From Swiss-Prot:
Protein name per UniProt: Cytochrome P450 monooxygenase 136
Class of enzymatic activity (EC top level): oxidoreductase
Subcellular locations according to the entry: Membrane
One Pfam match: p450
UniProt source species: Postia placenta (strain ATCC 44394 / Madison 698-R)
Keywords (A to Z) from UniProt: Heme, Iron, Membrane, Metal-binding, Monooxygenase, Oxidoreductase, Transmembrane, Transmembrane helix
């Protein structure tokens, strides 16, 4: 018996296609019906939950909501679905274990289109270009062999930092900026910093200050309403274009100036080995450099410099704030260093495993003030289901790292700075409570410079504690002025400005510091002492 219509006919194929689509739609709607969205606060038409999220310290309101709705919350910002992850387990389950779906990046209009932070890996969608940049970073920043080559500049710059802090403790924050920038500029461009007023450090600092001043509200509105890009500067609300032009001009200089210096040095045969020369040489193996190749190398180099500088600075400033508030921690760490290292030399990275209490201090610095409290948002590529809840494709995914660092099940009395919380724990408990597993991000978007940053921070902290006393400043009546443990709201959480006094611990430490090369001592005016 023959069928009335052959399955190979156009009509049969059309009917079959329509039926398949109908079944797919039924399945999709059924799945949405059987898998509800994650819980979250009630939303309004059009606004969604935008009216409930403060511009200042949004991580804190998310943390409060998590007590009601759990570690995975669904919000809507205008038309955009947003997933807030307040749980380390959820962040690891989704971004670590389902990286193929959860590694995309949402549109960051202010950063990419107004400020021209491109092409840079942290703004790129997950794809081939992202993998190209990631490969460069992995080769230069994630292998032990590569990291070992940076030890010399880290050792030298920590010596410079000690001398500078003793000679000019009033401007300790500027010395921290110089220290951090000097390491990264040497690694990225082979550029030696000889002054606190180094042009590239000044340029980066000015650019970041201008970018932050543009405000998070503008960034949010542009991301959700990109048509606002087309309003004229003179129109109410169009001022972001003027501010953006200033940032863009500074960014253009950061992209071009150091790169051109490296390229010129290579042509003259005087180029130093650095990340930029590596990328240029690696790309040249595949043929002549195209304008796109040059732009990508510039973007990769500039991103490592500016992103690594800002987050490392805030971690070291948090360290100084914690130490001036907790002299008992300094004294305990000094006793450990004295016992293990002695007083005749400075600690080195080789000593790290033998100094467990110092490692606890640094863990607590990371936890007490995570540098990037909400991380950098990911985006879901396709629909997914987690714990029976539907996650719409295209959702923005925000990790509340600040709240994770205060999980009461892991960190007792979480607002307290207390390095001893890591003592007496099993290896599993230590791994679970180590804040470094969260502060550098998750999954395939994990910060590629985390090992370099962590070793630079550790070495600076170890040598500061070994040789210096960090004291409260005295007022006119000779009374100690205690700084407030407060942090500025923003994408990067900096301590609010504070003062301290820094002196050598004793004559032994003073003599050790005095042996350092005097040509590496800088005042805030940038002149050799």
């Amino acid at each position: 018996m023959q069928l009335p219509v052959q399955l190979s006919s156009p009509l049969a194929l059309a009917v079959l296609s329509i039926a398949t689509c109908q079944l797919a739609l039924v399945w999709w709607y059924q799945r949405k019906r059987t898998n509800p969205l994650p819980p979250g606060p009630s939303a309004l038409p059009f606004l969604g939950n935008a009216h409930q999220i403060p511009l200042q310290y949004p991580e804190r309101i998310f943390s409060q909501w998590a007590r009601t709705y759990g570690g995975v919350m669904y919000l809507r910002l205008f038309k955009k679905s947003v997933l807030i992850l307040d749980s380390v387990k959820a962040a690891q389950d989704l971004m670590d274990k389902r990286g193929a779906k959860f590694s995309d990046r949402p549109q960051l209009t202010l950063i990419t289109d107004v400020f021209a932070f491109k092409p840079m890996m942290f703004t790129m969608p997950y794809g081939d270009l992202w993998r190209r940049h990631r490969k460069w970073y992995q080769a230069s920043l994630e292998s032990k062999a590569a990291l070992d080559t940076y030890n010399a500049v880290q050792e030298m710059e920590t010596c410079t930092l000690l001398s500078a802090l003793v000679s000019d403790s009033e401007h300790f924050a500027d010395q921290v900026k110089r220290f951090t920038g000097a390491i990264l500029l040497e690694i990225v461009y082979g550029h030696a910093v000889t002054s606190v007023k180094d042009d590239l450090i000044r340029l980066s600092d000015e650019m970041m200050t201008q970018a932050v001043s543009a405000g998070s509200l503008v960034a949010t509105l542009l991301d959700f309403f990109p048509f606002l890009m087309h309003i004229p500067e003179w129109f109410p609300g169009g001022g972001f274009k003027r501010e953006g032009a200033r940032v863009r001009h500074l960014m253009r200089q950061l992209l071009d100036v150091p790169f051109n210096e490296v390229q010129q040095a290579m042509l003259e045969g005087s180029g130093k080995a650095c990340l930029t020369t590596y990328m240029l040489e690696e790309q040249a193996e595949h043929g002549d450099l195209t304008p796109d190749d040059v732009d990508n190398i510039k973007g990769a180099a500039t991103l490592l410099f500016i992103a690594g500088t800002d987050t490392t600075i805030t971690t070291l400033l948090t360290f100084f704030l914690a130490m001036v508030l907790h002299p008992e921690v300094v004294h305990k760490a000094q006793a450990e260093i004295d016992r293990v290292v002695g007083r005749t030399r400075l600690p080195s990275l080789m000593d790290r495993d033998a100094l467990p209490y110092l490692d606890q201090v640094l863990k607590e610095v990371y936890r007490w003030n995570p540098p990037v409290p909400l991380g950098i948002p990911h985006q879901v590529r396709d629909d997914d289901v987690y714990n029976g809840r539907h996650i719409p494709g295209g959702s923005m995914v925000v990790s509340n790292i600040w709240s994770m660092s205060r999980d009461p099940d892991t960190y007792e009395d979480a607002d307290r700075f207390w390095p001893e919380r890591y003592e007496g724990k099993s290896s599993d408990e230590l791994a679970r409570s180590d804040p470094r597993r969260i502060v550098y991000g998750f999954g395939r978007r994990l910060c590629p410079g985390r090992f370099l940053a962590d070793s630079s921070i550790w070495l600076a902290a170890a040598r500061v504690i070994a040789t210096l006393d960090i004291r409260k400043v005295l007022d006119a009546e000779g009374k100690e002025m205690t700084p407030s443990a407060e942090f500025i709201s923003g994408a990067v959480s900096h301590p609010k400005p504070f003062s301290l006094d820094i002196l050598p611990r004793d004559e032994v430490a003073a003599k050790l510091i005095a042996q350092l090369d005097p040509n590496h001592l800088f005042s805030v005016q940038g002149e050799a002492i």
